Curated annotation (Swiss-Prot):
The keyword Hydrolase applies. Its cofactor is Zn(2+). NCBIfam families: pyrC_dimer. This is Dihydroorotase. One of its GO terms (molecular function) is zinc ion binding. One of its GO terms (biological process) is 'de novo' UMP biosynthetic process. PANTHER family: DIHYDROOROTASE (PTHR43137:SF1). The modification N6-carboxylysine is found at residue 98. It is an enzyme of class 3 (hydrolase). Substrate binds at residues 15-17, 41, 135, 218, 251, 263. Pathway: Pyrimidine metabolism; UMP biosynthesis via de novo pathway; (S)-dihydroorotate from bicarbonate: step 3/3. Binds 2 Zn(2+) ions per subunit. It catalyses: (S)-dihydroorotate + H2O = N-carbamoyl-L-aspartate + H(+).
């Protein structure tokens, strides 16, 4: 039977929620990943060092006994951010600030209204070596939802990179050929995370044969040509600029199967297996380890994980749902097969 052993991966973009939801989902990530970059869009958001340290303590308390998993904490960038906050964050071990343009995604109401007013704060991030994580979509109601990432590149990303050229930027969960091209053409201070859904699915998977609420995420799934461009980027000659970030975003089944359903796909349960499928289909299984376990650590300036995990070429059926607080959670590819299984 075919096996593949790789350095234990890191998830460089993860939503863990809080309370009972946190307790329900964190074990799935902790058994596959050594570390994860934890998104700060709680209600209320994680905006201060004290907020982040308290949230980290709650995550650690929710981990299975004996787990060596390490959460890497971030702060939610707001219009009120200061250079002093950046220095405090650096001193406390916070790895990054996350940009949510106001209204772009789940719990983004406190997000930034005008990033260009925060240029001195971004300059301090560059000076301190704190990363800037970007949800790269404009929120202008005039812009078609399928074009919001491409519009963000010209309106925001390129001007910011021109004004703060040494800022370390992660273009999060990229979904378009335009975003891949920006990262490929930018300096080594710009990288990107890519989710399993944007490497495996396109907008037909959301809209053909009925609306598929469990395939609804933001940024929304795009055309097949964009999916192919992402696969080419993560397996190509500049693949070192791209790394694993699931954007696994749990919402109760009742909140997804709804007249106004929530955006987000829960992939943490079988994340590594889903990515293995992508790389196998692309004839690039030899590049999975760098994407999952090396590129992100290098960009963040942290050592690779010490342990390994082993994937077996053995099919598994993903459960239709799993418990989630008082309700249930529908994982990515619920009820379907994945051709790989992580050995635990």
């Amino acid at each position: 039977m075919q096996t593949l052993t790789i350095i234990r991966p890191d998830d460089m973009h993860l939503h863990l929620r809080d309370g009972d939801a946190l307790k329900a989902v964190v074990p799935y990530t902790a058994r596959q990943m050594g570390r994860a970059v934890i998104m700060p869009n709680l209600k209320p958001p994680v905006v201060s060092v004290a907020d982040a340290l308290a949230y980290k303590a709650r995550i650690m308390a929710a981990l299975p006994e004996g787990s060596a998993f390490e959460p890497l904490m971030t702060l939610y960038l707001t219009d009120n951010a200061t250079s002093e906050l950046v220095r405090e964050a650096k001193a406390a071990g916070i790895v990054a600030f996350k940009l949510y343009p106001a209204g772009a995604t789940t719990n983004s109401d406190s997000g930034v209204t005008d990033l260009f007013k925060l240029i001195p704060v971004l300059e301090e991030m560059a000076k301190q070596g704190i990363l800037f994580l970007v949800h790269g979509e404009v929120t202008d109601p005039e812009i078609d939802i399928f074009d919001r990432e491409a519009a963000f590149i010209g309106r925001v990303m390129k001007p910011v990179l021109a004004q703060v050229p040494n800022l370390k930027v992660v273009f999060e969960h990229i979904t378009t050929a335009e975003a891949a091209r920006l990262v490929l053409e930018a300096g080594d201070n710009v990288a990107a995370t890519v989710t399993p859904q944007h490497l495996l699915l396109n907008r037909n998977d959301l809209l053909v044969g009925g609306v598929r609420p469990h395939h609804f995420c933001l940024p929304v799934l795009k055309r097949e040509t964009h999916r192919q461009a992402l696969v080419a980027a993560v397996t190509g000659e500049k693949a070192h600029k791209f790394f694993l970030g699931t954007d696994s975003a749990p919402h109760a089944k009742s909140a997804k199967e709804n007249a106004c359903g929530c955006a987000g796909m829960f992939s943490a349960m079988t994340a590594v297996e889903l990515y293995a499928e992508v790389f196998e289909k692309a004839g690039a299984l030899d590049k999975l380890e760098a994407f999952a376990s090396k590129n992100g650590a290098r960009f963040y300036g942290i050592p690779e994980n010490a342990g390994t995990i082993t994937l077996v070429k053995q099919s598994q059926t993903v459960p239709a749902s799993v418990p989630y607080g008082d309700g249930e959670l529908v994982p990515m590819r619920a009820g379907g097969e994945i051709g790989w299984t992580v050995q635990y």
